[in-house]
Amino acid sequence: LDGKIIASNKITCFNTRGTNYLGRTFAKNIDIPAGQVQALWIGINLPETARGKYNGNVSISANGVPAKSIKMEIEISGKTVADHGIDEGKHLSRLAWLNSNVGINNKITRGYIPVSREDKVIKILGRSTEIGDNGLPEKIMSYFTSSNQSISKQGGDIIDKPFQFIIEKENGEIVHLLPGKLQFTQQSPSFITWKVINTSDECDVVCNGRLEFDGFASFGLQIKAKKAISIKDIRLKVTMDKDKATYMMGLNKEGGLRPKDWQWKWDTTKNQDALWTGAVNGGLQIKWKAENYVLPLVNIYYDFGCLHLPPSWGNEGKGGVNVYEKGKSVIINAYSGTREMKKGEQLNYDFELLETPDRKRVV
């Protein structure tokens, strides 16, 4: 219209591209079963100066069929809507929030302190984590007092033993992984990252870790087979101090006192992939995931965006988690069961941690 245009980068199909919850751009294809109908949700960020009729074409393409061009015309009155109509749900303007970058930055929230490191020990507010040679936590401590109202100089152990990532072959033999050099790759006031390559005759395991100022940590364990391997089990074993495992919530267990024994299997009909067990002044939340993770929808919308079974941990329904007492410790054993790995095949055994309590500076 009179030489004016609405640029294509102002037009978004929310189904096919956008910004994810980590602030990263993505694009994806849509799979539609034969005979089914799929609505495409499209938003246009109109310039405030736009008015009149605008004409254009939308091209829709699919595998195996020619692209279809659809003519589109919109008429703009020129009147502006307050806050883009976000205050009224009927306008559906809030769909734009799906691509928001609000709150995505590396700034430290007020009340926390910068992340610091002394050799292999990473310190955050009220907690410390020592990284083992293999890249996994070797020691996690809480310095919060029993009332959780102050921080003491004397810390208490949250875990009794280092995290163990175990690859057991069909014959019962454990794959001996030799850690390479532990490299701290990035450090800022809000986070620290590190990397280790663990090697063996059968496979390599690359460990990437990240710990943030509030106690959130993420771990990526990528296994690459050097030759064909028959596997009995691949598991992550976390040994917690019994005094720091008083309560439990998650994996189909409502919040309350931790049972002496709890067994759980992967089931994507339920939004369950994480466990918290702890006490008032120390604990761990663990979430198991893989490369196909997408944040599920909740409540009545869950069936429209359910949990994806991790190919690694889930292993076609063979995987699960057992929680049980052993002496003065509580064992969290996340197993994945039998499988065959071909030469060159890769598996991603990822998980997240939250070292609790997660709270701001106290007196």
Which stretches of residues belong to each language-model region?
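C-terminal edge beta-strand
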Residues: 68-77
